[in-house]
Amino acid sequence: MPGRLPPRLTCAFVALLVAPSSHSQSKAVVNEPSAFPSPETLFYSAEWRLIFAGDARLSLEPRKRSDKTEWESKLEVESGGLVSKLYKIDDKYHMAMEDQFCTTATNLDAMEGKRHHEVKVTYDYSRRKASYEEHDLVKNISKTAETEIPGCVTDILGALYKLRTLRLEPGQSAQIPVSDGKKSVSARVEAQEREQIKTKVGTFNTVRYEAFVFNGVLFARKAQLQMWLSDDARSLPVQIRARMSFPVGSITFTLDKVEHP
C-alpha cells in the first residue's frame, strides 16, 4: 500500500534509522574501535511505552566485486515479551549496496500478526528506475510500482549508512536521495545536539539527528524519526526513536552489543 511503512521497519530504521566527536564509553563497548565503514553486527533492544518490545540485529559486510567493494546489510527484527503476545512480528530485511552506499536491491520478508508479505525493490541505474514488487503471501495478491531515481539513491536503511559517512556537526544538515521503489525524494537530515546516551555496553557521546521522511515526504504516516550516532570515527547508531501518533506512541531501539568480525 503506497505510503505505508512496515511497522517494525518504521522504528528500526525502521525504524529505523545515524554523526561523530570523542567517546567516553567503558572498554566493554568495543575492544578496538573501527572507523566506519567496516564489517559490523549491531544488536538492539526495543522499548515501547516503557516495556520491552523485542530485539533487532543489524549487520554490514563487504563483498568484493572485481576492483570495487560492495556492501551487504541484513536487518532482523523480532517482537518479544508482552508485545509479541499482542502482535507478533518477525521481519527480515536484506539490502545490497554499491561502493558509495547506493542501494541496488532490497528484499523484505515480513510476518506481522496474521499478515505475511514479501517486498522486493530493484534499483536499475542504467534506466534510472526503481521497480517495486509486493506479494501478499496470505491473500495471494501482488502489487507493482515504478519510480524514477537519480544516479545514486538509498533505501530507508541505506540512508542510515550514507548519513554515517557525512560526519555532520550540530547545526548542519544534508539532503539524501531516498526511494522505496514507489516514490523518490530528497530527504533532509539535521544534526541537532550533542547528547550523552547510556546503554548496556557503556556511555556514548553522540550527535542527535532528525530525518524528515514521514508526514507525506516519503511515508504518509505522521511521525518523527530521531537517531543518536556516536561522536567518533565509528559513527555507531546508538539509539533510534520513532515518535508516532496515538495509539502507537514512541518506539526506541537502544544499542546492546557491538561485534566486529
Predicted segment positions?
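Bacterial N-terminal signal peptides that target proteins for export
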Residues: 1-11
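Hydrophobic, well-structured mid-protein blocks that either form specific transmembrane helices
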Residues: 119-161
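Acidic, serine/threonine-rich low-complexity disordered tracts
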Residues: 25-125, 165-261
